[in-house]
Amino acid sequence: MDDQNRNLILATGLSFVVILVWFLLFPPPEMVEDPNAIPPAAETGGVETDTGIALTPPVTVADAPAGADTTAPSEVALSEAARIDIDTPAVEGSISLLGGRIDDLSLRNYFTEVDGDQIVRLLSPVGSDDPYYALYGWTPSGDLGYADVPTSDTPWELESGTILTPDSPITLAWDNGSGLIFRRTIEIDDRFMFQVTQSVENTGGAEVNLAPYGIVARHGLPSDLQNFFILHEGVVRKVDGELSELGYSDLPDLDIIAREGVPAEVMEVETNGWIGFTDKYWMTTLIPGENQSFVSVVKYVPSAEIYQTEARLPYMSIAPGETAEVTTQLFAGAKEAEAIRDYENAEPGLIASLFGAEQDASRGEIPRFIDSIDWGWFYFLTKPLFWLLHWLNGAIGNMGLAIISLTLIVKAVLFPLAYRSYVSMAKMKELQPEIEKLKESAGDDRQKLQQGMMELYKKNKVNPAGGCLPILLQIPIFFSLYKVIFVTLELRHAPFFGWLNDLSAPDSSSIINLYGLLPNPAPEPESIMALIFIGILPLLLGISMWLQQKLNPAPTDAMQAQIFAWLPWVFMFMLGSFASGLLVYWIANNTLTFTQQYLIMRSQGFKPDVFGNIRSSFKKKAKEEK
């Protein structure tokens, strides 16, 4: 087998190995409800543990009669309590006066379907199909109990404001009737950030100690859970400068902490941390105040299948006649890189600055918030590639063309490596006849063959590994490009041309709809039919890989020839259900690689006979059939 074919097998084999290892190490989680699950901690008065960590009250979940449907349409759930509307350019929804929950939030600029008019619902109330909400409150201590502080079912009253907008905050109030008046002022900006100020006024005659907290709770798994090995979905948090992640499947396996009564993980944060849930495109995150210490808690309540993140702040002493307050933030929205970077208030960096990114100091400072986007292992490559793609999309106005342009730029940058690789391959091609003679003369004496080949390489100043190293160096860049295209929010519902109206979805064309000529939908990506009725892009991908093979004659070994003959079509079916934006990248990359290799090989005196190799493969196949 010549070295050029060996390099191609090496690159293909490495891709297969990486995919297989990922699936073996990180299989999709299988969530099975435990019938013997431990119930959440019971409500008690005066909760301050011997560790000094305050406990939050369990979230109230209404009981349903046996055999009843435990979910209800969101409209019904929303009507069960008085509400205050939310109205901003980016989001719409409402806040429930029952518990003061932020539990109804939809994203105005994002739709569930490409041609649909239903906007994405991020947060939903208890009683709906997918309850997901943020809740705030106070943990009591001493003689105070949970009846003395606001909890998840406290009836708040609207004290000021009418509708929550970027220009008009609202204030909720609740008097416990025992000398404590609680207030909650909620503000929102024009993107996705809430600011929640909790205060307590002590009108009684004794000092009280209370600990504020925030909760983000999710009942059950997300309906749009991707479960894809290169994407993190679940808990994301920053603890003293370090980013920590837990998948949804990890939470039930956490150790059961006695004081929590359920599987949980507790971390103390000295300053500038945050915690919440992240999905592929959306995120809901609690952010305590700047330089605020707190306890970061992740837990799972098996009895109700609730995934929960909490930020518990230290106890505060409130003397008679005094008022204490604490301010936290809540991010609930789309993972728009520019918005998240602005909230981080980070300098964009050289690469991002070159492509139009600017610092916005008006939105606070949340350290490492940009890392809530899953940049992957090669983040140092993924980030600049993302900003370049983002800039190209803005400049060109078409994400498909931006992907092709990005591929072209990366190919240009990597040209020196590719040139060395292909020159080395061309030189090895020239030596192939002499290598064959050495094999014949050496026979079964492998030591003699190796010695003769090394002398031949030395005489002709050829490095046999010269074609492999550039390929290996390009692998991290390949994975970074793959990651960028996979996680980029701008790819969602982004059109290219013709039938390609969503680059984040698989190619919708198939023989069923005459490849886009008929309005019939393509098979679901998860179905077996999708493997059979593949679209135009997977076909083009297979053809581009097949043509790339034809730059070289087929291997003389029959087994190797069969493997090479099947590889393009195996990849065509394997990758057919991937996002069409990824296929656009792979097709563009294969086309540019073919062109580069053809021109470089010709410049070195080796003239690839593409059409001759194609004819030869068909003649060989016809002979085998006879």
Swiss-Prot record:
Coiled coil: none annotated. CDD domains: 5TM_YidC_Alb3 (cd20070), EcYidC-like_peri (cd19961). The chain crosses the membrane at residues 8-28, 399-419, 469-489, 527-547, 563-583. It is a multi-pass membrane protein. One of its GO terms (cellular component) is plasma membrane. It is found in: Cell inner membrane. One of its GO terms (molecular function) is membrane insertase activity. InterPro entries: Membr_insert_YidC, Membr_insert_YidC_N, YidC/ALB3/OXA1/COX18, YidC/Oxa/ALB_C, YidC_ALB_C, YidC_periplasmic_sf. Its main location: membrane. Keywords: Cell inner membrane, Cell membrane, Chaperone, Membrane, Protein transport, Transmembrane, Transmembrane helix, Transport. GO terms for biological process: protein insertion into membrane; protein transport. It comes from the Bacteria. PANTHER family: CYTOCHROME C OXIDASE ASSEMBLY PROTEIN COX18, MITOCHONDRIAL, OXA1. Interacts with the Sec translocase complex via SecD. Specifically interacts with transmembrane segments of nascent integral membrane proteins during membrane integration. Required for the insertion and/or proper folding and/or complex formation of integral membrane proteins into the membrane. Involved in integration of membrane proteins that insert both dependently and independently of the Sec translocase complex, as well as at least some lipoproteins. Aids folding of multispanning membrane proteins. Belongs to the OXA1/ALB3/YidC family. Type 1 subfamily. This is Membrane protein insertase YidC. It comes from Jannaschia sp. (strain CCS1). The lineage of its organism: Bacteria, Pseudomonadati, Pseudomonadota, Alphaproteobacteria, Rhodobacterales.
